[in-house]
Amino acid sequence: MIGDILLFGTLLMNAGAVLNFKLKKKDTQGFGEESKEPSTGDNIREFLLSLRYFRIFIALWNVFMMLCMIVLFGS
């Protein structure tokens, strides 16, 4: 059960890190505009952009997960 959860999290993190969409930050229009709460879409976009910076960490996590799957969860 815990192996399935770790595998699911790893695959989800990999999918987010390798997305190749042109995600752009939302531009502000000027000084007169009041800052609004970021929408859910804006939060998701920011999260995916931040995942791209952690590709090396994600690659090391993948190697660690492969070793765990062989050593701990192998039958």
Swiss-Prot record:
TM stretches of this protein: 54-74
Topological relation to the membrane, as annotated: Single-pass type I membrane protein
Keyword Membrane among record annotations: yes
Cytoplasmic-side positions: 75
Membrane side Extracellular: residue ranges: 18-53
A GO cellular component annotation in the UniProt record: membrane
Signal peptide extent: 1-17
Keywords carried by this UniProt record: Membrane, Signal, Transmembrane, Transmembrane helix
Compartment(s): Membrane
Disulfide bridge positions per record: none
PANTHER family in UniProt: SMALL INTEGRAL MEMBRANE PROTEIN 7
Family, per entry: Belongs to the SMIM7 family.
Protein name according to UniProt: Small integral membrane protein 7
Species: Mus musculus
Record lineage: Eukaryota, Metazoa, Chordata, Craniata, Vertebrata
UniProt gene name: Smim7
